[in-house]
A protein has these predicted regions:
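Sec-dependent N-terminal signal peptides
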Residues: 5-14
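Short N-proximal segments of mature Sec-exported proteins
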Residues: 22-85, 89
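Surface-exposed, polar helix/loop patches in the mature regions of secreted/periplasmic/lumenal proteins
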Residues: 76-112
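N-terminal secretory signal peptides that target proteins for export/translocation
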Residues: 1-3
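N-terminal signal peptide c-region/cleavage motif recognized by signal peptidases
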Residues: 15-20
Length: 112
């Protein structure tokens, strides 16, 4: 094998191992599915996945002092409406991507 092929293989391995682990579960479904499931009240698995994602963020990442973490005073119904808006605007995205964006937005609303 030539040196350039070996170097290329090493480069590919280096870049692929730098990616984060894939997202599993309901958060990996499409926003299009979220919108359709919301219409018939079948969205609770996805919503609970998002709530778990935010809870995990609070447990392992959040360093602030707000007693409810990034949730603040936001309840699950409000999070569902926020995801409705996100997923309607981004149907090819995922609830996971929406949850990440929501965490950023919620954290920005907390007192500094």
């Amino acid at each position: 094998m030539s040196k350039s092929k070996v170097a290329f293989a090493i480069l590919i391995l280096a870049f692929t191992s730098a990616y984060s682990a894939p997202i599993k579960g309901a958060g990996a479904s499409s926003c299009g599915l979220w919108v359709e499931d919301r219409k018939v009240g079948a969205h609770f698995v996805q919503l609970n996945w998002v709530l778990g994602f935010i809870s995990a963020y609070n447990e392992y990442v959040y360093k602030g002092r707000a007693p409810n973490g990034v949730f603040g005073n936001v309840d699950p119904s409000a999070i569902g409406v926020w995801l409705d808006n996100y997923c309607q605007a981004n149907p090819l995205s995922t609830p996971y991507a929406g949850a990440r964006r929501l965490v950023e937005e919620l954290e920005s609303l907390l007192p500094k």
